[in-house]
A protein has these predicted regions:
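N-terminal presequence-like segments and the immediate start of the first folded domain
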Residues: 1-66, 70-83, 89-136
């Protein structure tokens, strides 16, 4: 049986600007993925379901990312394996706080990323939700 190794190429093509080089790439190509992991929306909740960082976008962002890390580790992966993120927030004006929190976790292996402002999330105290795909 052939042992396939995933090859992940991350890039930004010439001619397209990437004003946030610290948090995303324009494309990621995954050749021969061994496994794909699809994460459901991760919220700023602790293991008991309590909201973490109520009213604090940066703290809620950090908790969402820590929850993604927990899910990925349970599935055999890590944050470095994330190739795509969709972020839903109730307040896009707090974009700088979101970026600051993300930069603490995503340093070298940046995913593709989309951020969308929404009216509400599952609970009025939630400010942000992350959905992700990872490739091993």
């Amino acid at each position: 049986m052939e042992n396939r190794m995933s090859k992940i190429i991350r890039g930004d093509p010439p001619g397209l600007t990437n004003v946030r080089k610290s948090i995303y790439h324009h494309y990621i190509r995954v050749d021969n993925p061994k496994s794909l992991i699809f994460l459901s929306g991760q919220l700023s909740r602790d293991a008991f379901g309590n909201i973490v960082g109520k009213g604090d976008m940066k703290e809620q962002t950090k908790q969402c990312i820590q929850n993604m890390q927990t899910v990925l580790e349970a599935a055999g992966g890590s944050l470095d394996d994330i190739v795509s993120i969709v972020v839903y927030t109730t307040d896009i004006r707090q974009f700088k706080e979101i970026v600051a929190a993300r930069e603490e976790f995503f340093i070298n292996k940046l995913p593709t990323s989309t951020i969308v402002e929404v009216n509400h999330l599952a609970d009025p105290g939630l400010l942000i939700e992350f959905q992700a795909t990872a490739a091993l």
